[in-house]
């Protein structure tokens, strides 16, 4: 195996995270098991090839069983055992959930929900991010852990808390209200500026002094949307501040890199990870298939591409996933044979250089006892365990891909701020959601075999042939000008409805929709005209659409397709215009998936985009990782039939030579070191 190229620069004196090849890891919770099980654990880890273990994630009550008491006996022994067996440690700070004695002595640290009720201990994350009492106790524990293990040879990485903000991101107590007011003072300076930003002349909400402002708890009616989005921003910043406080403590005692596990997965939207990503020494993400979605497998690819975007195109760590079923969905589906491997390598294809799981050994008790694990309740004579061992061997075969990355010609813009604002309480229709529109856009490109980067509205767009902007409801003047400049200089863009509508304060841009993008697109919309969820309209192209139409007028743009029925027959539904040396498209409705794919094919071809893989229903994924000297083609076949892909080189999974055509069996993954680097 070859030592990994440094994947991300450590900050504030930290070293870079390096590893021999692709890390294969897990959450390891030995405190749940008798000590005689630990020796078997490390033997099995070595058999499977597991070489990175996250420990002490929920260790707080073990390290501090009572006030003033510390017990590091178990953690000492586990660290030494792992190190002796060549297993590196991703060491948790132990602060993710407070011990019962702390919430008993200080119930004021407990989070308060938007209805004003206190959330009790007994689950996890029973703390408010703004609680000064919790911070004092948590940082004191971090100090002890960092001082004791800051130079332990097993520690490869620090793991701050766990899934920050998963349950407690939005807290509505008095400590939070005070911190929110401080954040608002820093943002606006004067109460007059805040009133202007929040539009408080509406509904007699004008504030006279800072003390009058609280958290946006539930009201008798809908809440002020400008206050709500600022509270989302504040809450993300407040948890980021907490993360920084833990990092400051760790830096005093250790130069090991520091991270925390993001949750770029399905519906979770509590934190703005564009602001978080620069703060971690390497981006790490937890991802779980969510079967409440129409297409969980395509969402996995989207999440992996978004995580790579957060990492700035550099390598990142898949910190958690499952071998099979989870425990927290209404219907927790097991994975089919081979699916765990396909999921894992889909992440690797999109830039991951660690494949880790929750958890090592399935728990006997607790809320997650039916969550799958590397070692299931039934033990090692199981299909799951055999696939785990095979996956470890496969990752070893792929070690040489480390240091390469993914290059895409197409970017899709994504914004947590726009998500928060677009899905507010008061919007034209609740049948349309931001994430659905983003996922649909991505799926259409994915099914065309087109590789995609997910980027922020502030990203450098100069390297892309096509930029797609799905439902970017909230956009700043600078971001709008940034996209217009990209098109002016020869880029191609596709903007979809409900984009550019408001500024950063959720203030509607006057003069007609789509506000910030009106001039770029050569159109104006005088009125939204949403449809009932069971209604459809037909376009003169033959396409079917639903959920949304607009009273649109072209102002220089060409009408590519018009409605032939519905509330606005004859009105343009798709437009195209030249802008500078580039082209800007606009989609004013929700096309059915096949029609959206057809539109994306037309737009991408016009932009000069060449698909890497074949068109499919998402069952075949083709992704290339490369650098200046090497090129690797990943082909992931989720389908029930064998597929053939043009390729030549050395196939790494099976160790065979590919002359001109790669055959990938149903349900399999193949990775070819291509003969000719790009």
Region spans (language model):
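Polysaccharide-binding and catalytic clefts of secreted carbohydrate-active enzymes
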Residues: 115-282, 286-300
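Carbohydrate-binding surfaces of carbohydrate-active enzymes
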Residues: 210-213, 244, 252, 285-678
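Short, well-ordered coil/turn segments that N-cap beta-strands
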Residues: 20-22, 49-51, 83-89, 151-156, ...
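Aromatic-lined substrate-binding rim segments of carbohydrate-active enzymes
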Residues: 40-47, 51-119, 146, 245-253, ...
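N-terminal carbohydrate-binding accessory modules
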Residues: 1-54, 65, 80-84, 88, ...
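The substrate-binding groove and active-site-proximal loops of carbohydrate-active enzymes
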Residues: 23-35, 56-73, 120-139, 164-169, ...
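Short, acidic/polar
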Residues: 32-47, 138-144, 265-276, 336-344
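Conserved, mostly hydrophobic/aromatic
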Residues: 26, 45, 53, 82, ...
């Amino acid at each position: 195996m070859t030592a990994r190229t440094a994947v991300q620069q450590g900050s504030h004196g930290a070293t870079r995270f390096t590893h021999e090849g692709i890390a294969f890891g897990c959450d390891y919770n030995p405190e749940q098991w008798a000590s005689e099980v630990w020796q078997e654990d490390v033997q099995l880890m070595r058999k499977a090839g597991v070489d990175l273990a996250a420990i002490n994630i929920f260790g707080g009550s073990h390290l501090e069983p009572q006030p003033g008491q510390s017990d590091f006996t178990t953690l000492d022994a586990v660290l030494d055992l792992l190190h002796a067996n060549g297993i590196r440690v991703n060491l948790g700070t132990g602060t993710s959930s407070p011990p019962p004695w702390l919430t008993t002595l200080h119930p004021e640290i407990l989070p308060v929900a938007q209805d004003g009720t206190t959330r009790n201990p007994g689950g996890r994350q029973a703390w408010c991010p703004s609680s000064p009492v919790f911070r004092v106790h948590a940082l004191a524990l971090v100090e002890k852990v960092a001082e004791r293990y800051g130079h332990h040879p097993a520690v490869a990485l620090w793991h701050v808390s766990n899934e920050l903000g998963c349950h407690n991101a939005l807290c509505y107590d008095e400590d939070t209200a005070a911190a929110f007011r401080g954040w608002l003072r820093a943002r606006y300076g004067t109460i007059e500026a805040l009133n202007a930003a929040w539009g408080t002349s509406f509904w007699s909400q004008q504030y006279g002094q800072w003390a009058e402002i609280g958290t946006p708890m539930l009201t008798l009616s809908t809440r002020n949307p400008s206050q709500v989005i600022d509270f989302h921003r504040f809450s993300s910043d407040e948890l980021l501040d907490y993360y920084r406080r833990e990092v400051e403590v760790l830096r005093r005692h250790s130069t090991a890199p520091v991270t925390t596990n993001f949750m770029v997965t399905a519906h979770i939207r509590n934190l703005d990870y564009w602001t978080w990503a620069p703060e971690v020494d390497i981006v790490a993400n937890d991802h779980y298939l969510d079967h409440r979605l129409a297409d969980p497998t395509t969402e996995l690819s989207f999440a992996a591409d978004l995580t790579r975007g957060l990492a700035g195109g550099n390598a990142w760590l898949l910190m958690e996933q499952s071998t099979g079923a989870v425990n927290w969905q209404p219907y927790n589906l097991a994975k089919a044979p081979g699916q765990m491997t396909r999921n894992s390598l889909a992440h690797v294809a999109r830039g991951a250089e660690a494949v880790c799981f929750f958890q090592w050994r399935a728990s006997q008790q607790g809320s997650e006892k039916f969550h799958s694990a590397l070692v299931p309740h039934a033990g090692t004579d199981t299909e799951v365990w055999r696939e785990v061992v095979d996956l470890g061997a496969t990752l070893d075969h792929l070690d040489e891909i480390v240091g390469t990355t993914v290059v895409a010609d197409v970017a899709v813009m994504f914004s947590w701020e726009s998500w928060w604002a677009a899905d507010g309480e008061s919007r034209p229709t609740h049948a349309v959601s931001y994430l659905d529109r983003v996922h649909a856009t991505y799926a259409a490109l994915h099914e065309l075999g087109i590789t995609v980067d997910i980027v922020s509205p502030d990203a450098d767009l100069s390297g892309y042939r096509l930029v797609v902007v799905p439902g970017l409801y909230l956009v700043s003047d600078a971001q709008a000008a940034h996209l217009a400049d990209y098109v002016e200089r020869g880029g191609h863009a596709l903007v979809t409805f409900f984009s550019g509508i408001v500024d950063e304060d959720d203030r509607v841009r006057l003069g007609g929709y789509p506000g910030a993008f009106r001039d770029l697109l050569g159109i104006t919309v005088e009125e939204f005209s949403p449809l009932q969820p069971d209604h459809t309209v037909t376009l003169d192209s033959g396409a079917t659409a639903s959920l949304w139409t607009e009273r649109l007028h072209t102002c220089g743009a060409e009408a590519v397709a018009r409605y032939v029925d519905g509330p606005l027959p004859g009105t343009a539904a798709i437009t195209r215009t030249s802008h500078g040396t580039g082209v800007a498209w606009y989609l004013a409705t929700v096309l059915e998936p096949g029609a959206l794919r057809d539109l994306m094919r037309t737009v991408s071809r016009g932009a000069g985009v060449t698909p890497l893989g074949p068109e499919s229903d998402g069952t075949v994924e083709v992704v290339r990782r490369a650098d200046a000297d090497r090129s690797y083609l990943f082909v992931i076949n989720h389908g029930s039939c064998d597929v053939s892909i043009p390729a030549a080189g050395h196939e790494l999974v099976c160790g065979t030579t590919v002359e001109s055509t790669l055959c990938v069996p149903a349900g399999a993954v193949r990775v070819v070191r291509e003969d000719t680097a790009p």
